[in-house]
């Protein structure tokens, strides 16, 4: 985690100095999305036996329409053999951006997708809880059966049916043991 954090901090400082945090963040997000949707390209960029010149050529094609800073940054990662850590670097970079902009990431897990109205209500409630702007990342997980699980930083609020059933099971175990 130390090395990816250093790379993320370096890019963040560059974005801040050039007053291009939004543009660089958007380009970095696009790069990550492209790599996630094309696993073969990611493998090629990460595989140590592939020639660096070939990796840079692929990187140029992949990032041709992105900010120059991201294009150069990817080449530095290729030179330093750190492309396999891109996802972790990206997550850390986004954390730095959120901190700078006083935004909190809230991960919301529900058994079914939320509609716009439900999402807005949850966002308003979470904004009150975190005393600031929130960025919601939603996922669906049918195993929670019903309800909602919210993660804000290192705090988890489990209001799911699965969580309640697990809690009840633990209470019953304790009752059985002490009886």
Curated annotation (Swiss-Prot):
Gene Ontology cellular component list: plasma membrane; proton-transporting ATP synthase complex
Topology in membrane: Peripheral membrane protein
Annotated Pfam families: OSCP
InterPro entries (alphabetical): ATP_synth_OSCP/delta_N_sf, ATPase_OSCP/d_CS, ATPase_OSCP/dsu
Cellular location(s): Cell membrane
Principal subcellular localization: membrane
GO molecular function: proton-transporting ATP synthase activity, rotational mechanism
UniProt keyword annotations, A-Z: ATP synthesis, Cell membrane, CF(1), Hydrogen ion transport, Ion transport, Membrane, Transport
Function: F(1)F(0) ATP synthase produces ATP from ADP in the presence of a proton or sodium gradient. F-type ATPases consist of two structural domains, F(1) containing the extramembraneous catalytic core and F(0) containing the membrane proton channel, linked together by a central stalk and a peripheral stalk. During catalysis, ATP synthesis in the catalytic domain of F(1) is coupled via a rotary mechanism of the central stalk subunits to proton translocation.
Family assignment from sequence similarity: Belongs to the ATPase delta chain family.
Subunit structure, interactors included: F-type ATPases have 2 components, F(1) - the catalytic core - and F(0) - the membrane proton channel. F(1) has five subunits: alpha(3), beta(3), gamma(1), delta(1), epsilon(1). F(0) has three main subunits: a(1), b(2) and c(10-14). The alpha and beta chains form an alternating ring which encloses part of the gamma chain. F(1) is attached to F(0) by a central stalk formed by the gamma and epsilon chains, while a peripheral stalk is formed by the delta and b chains.
Protein name: ATP synthase subunit delta
């Amino acid at each position: 985690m130390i090395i990816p954090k250093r790379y993320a901090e370096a890019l963040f400082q560059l974005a801040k100095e050039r007053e291009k945090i939004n543009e660089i963040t958007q380009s970095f997000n696009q790069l990550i999305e492209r790599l996630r949707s094309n696993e073969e390209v990611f493998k090629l960029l990460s595989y140590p036996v592939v020639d660096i010149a070939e990796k840079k050529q692929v990187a140029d094609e992949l990032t041709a329409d992105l900010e120059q800073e991201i294009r150069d940054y990817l080449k530095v990662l290729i030179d330093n053999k750190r492309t396999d850590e891109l996802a972790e670097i990206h997550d850390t970079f986004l954390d730095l951006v959120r901190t700078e902009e006083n935004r909190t990431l809230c991960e919301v897990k529900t058994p079914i997708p939320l509609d716009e109205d439900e999402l807005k209500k949850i966002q308003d409630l979470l904004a009150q809880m975190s005393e600031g702007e929130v960025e919601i990342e939603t996922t669906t997980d049918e195993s929670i059966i019903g309800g909602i699980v919210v993660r804000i930083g290192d705090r988890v609020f489990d209001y799911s049916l699965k969580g309640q059933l697990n809690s009840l099971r633990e209470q019953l175990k304790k009752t059985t043991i002490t009886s």
